[in-house]
């Protein structure tokens, strides 16, 4: 990939270097489409076993020893109950985008990193060992029993 030369970069700055620069946009869906999609997503079925899996996953970020997963020394602050809600809704949206009317454990696993990474704070020990929230969440995903 080549970078623009100095003059081209100055043109880019002149065009884009202000906060009021509004890109041209075109409507791709209507408000009605969005509201209908939301309605469908809300109706997507989540089995009790999958709900329990979601709750266990989030609770594991707060009390991993209870689940036999060795990451407690690396978690300063686990995910809040809002993560449980976000993980459920995001898994439903994932199922919707795949044309299914039900959530699978794989839907949950597919979105877990995106939902949880900013909700799990790591300790200084974790940072010293070059571990971050993603590696900790991945260990939970790998070791937490899947229904």
Question: Locations of the language-model features?
Answer:
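C-terminal engagement/docking regions of AAA+ P-loop ATPases
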Residues: 63-147
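Conserved C-terminal "switch" segment of AAA+ ATPases
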Residues: 1-71, 97-101, 105, 126-130, ...
